[in-house]
Amino acid sequence: MAEENQVATEEQQTPFEMQIQRIYIKDVSFEAPNLPNIFHQEWKPQLGFDLDTETREIGEDTYEVVLHINVQTTLEDSNDVAFICEVKQAGVFTIKGIEGIQLAHCLAAKCPEVLYPYARELISSLVNRGTFPALNLSPVNFDALFMDYLARQQAEENGESTTNTTLN
């Protein structure tokens, strides 16, 4: 009995461990289809921002997480596309000591939280190299996005209608 309690206690006290193995650019694209004509228009940009993540297990306790960010900027007056920037920032993470919803939270929120500053800097650099005014993307609350996702999943399981939450 004492041994069973000791084993159960040791299992409960397994420490959570997340290690970054590698961070890399998986795909990047920058398009400015209306250059140089767009430089003669008044700069009143409308920013479209789309964010998504993709996760896959690539080994025991090892996961690749890819953060997809698509930024499209159009001019308010003409609706001409100023630029489109698509980035897939990826990382390989070793995650031990958690499973289930905690693992899902780590993969959907904590790992993208690590990747986002890299993607944001890359997008800013690409926009700058296109000679457009500086683009500083706001921080993203990945924990809140994950909680929203869980709430929508729960509502769908209960047969309730849901509305999509979009980042703009």
From Swiss-Prot:
Keywords: Chaperone, Cytoplasm, Protein transport, Translocation, Transport
Subcellular location: Cytoplasm
Entry-linked InterPro entries: SecB, SecB-like_sf
GO cellular component, one term: cytoplasm
GO terms, biological process: protein folding; protein tetramerization; protein transport
Domain of life from the UniProt record: Bacteria
GO terms assigned for molecular function: unfolded protein binding
Database matches in SUPFAM superfamilies: SecB-like
Family recorded in the similarity comment: Belongs to the SecB family.
Assembly: Homotetramer, a dimer of dimers. One homotetramer interacts with 1 SecA dimer.
Main function: One of the proteins required for the normal export of preproteins out of the cell cytoplasm. It is a molecular chaperone that binds to a subset of precursor proteins, maintaining them in a translocation-competent state. It also specifically binds to its receptor SecA.
PANTHER family linked to this entry: PROTEIN-EXPORT PROTEIN SECB, PTHR36918
NCBIfam families: PRK05751.1-4, secB
Protein name, UniProt field: Protein-export protein SecB
Originating organism: Glaesserella parasuis serovar 5 (strain SH0165) (Haemophilus parasuis)
